[in-house]
Amino acid sequence: MCHQKLTISWFAMVLLVSPLMAIWELEKDVYVVEVDWSPGAPGERVVLTCDTSEEDDIIWTSDQSSEVVGSGKTLIVQVKEFSDAGQYTCHKGGETLSHSRLLLHKKEDGIWSTDILKDQKDPKNKTFLKCEAANYSGRFTCWWLTAVSTDLKFSLKSSSSSSDSRSVTCGAASLSTEKVTVDQRDYNKYSVACQEDITCPTAEETLPIELVMEAQHKYKYENYSTGFFIRDIIKPDPPKNLQLKPLKSSQVEVSWEYPDSWSTPHSYFSLKFFVQVYRKKEKKGESLLVDKPSAKIRCSKGGEVRVRAQDHYYNSSWSEWASVSCN
């Protein structure tokens, strides 16, 4: 988690009272309050200061209350529940002076909450973020699932700013138009494209890319971390331009090309290919594993030839299938 120091100025601010850094600034005028969710925990004491040189006739309101919640230049809020979070605004004479938004990051039994995102159930450990790269250019896409539909905000970025870390720039998250169904429940899918700032595709990776995704839902804050080498998230795009050339009997020669997105030169960034004859009524057809972009195989009417690709030298994920009919 990136904790940012609070700067004392005439701007609206939160005064850090907890020695455990339980309150920190997420962005301008937005603060995360880390709250112990166990029964009997006292919550966190937050002091808000109005951005004004005036001292008198100041009142405070909250977007969670229809009544005035305090008066004076400072306001003390004991934050324990989500009803204590929200946007606090100071006013004088009908004029808005400044505001601060408080978000809760809850911790229960020593574990930070992970309520916003769906666990995608990696066999070894919890997986909330999944990432894939179509080549070694340093560009990749990450995605996640959530059952939440409204009042969401996501930000994906490098989790470390040290000079020896791999810096990454990510775009804005976008919502897929299609739902993803898991265990008979529909989820929204968000994705974001990222690019490593400095990359050398032919160099061996010695440090992983480390990312943190910050999620906000209404007044709730959570973060999710992931780390990987580009080589471990490679999934080539499918081969393109599949063509069949009839030979004698039912034998055909199938040829294809490398996907446009794959790294070049192909003599260095080689792919291997899995070729399969597929028929709906047959569980398993003839198949071949080849290094070059062509193969001879038997395929009769009603079947199709399918081809998928994998990094030749590293056990990457296989691409999706590309196919051509044998008719």
Swiss-Prot record:
One of its GO terms (cellular component) is membrane. GO terms for molecular function: cytokine activity; cytokine receptor activity. Residues 238-327 form the Fibronectin type-III domain. Residues 23-106 form the Ig-like C2-type domain. Gene3D superfamilies: Immunoglobulins. Belongs to the IL-12B family. This is Interleukin-12 subunit beta. It comes from Sigmodon hispidus.
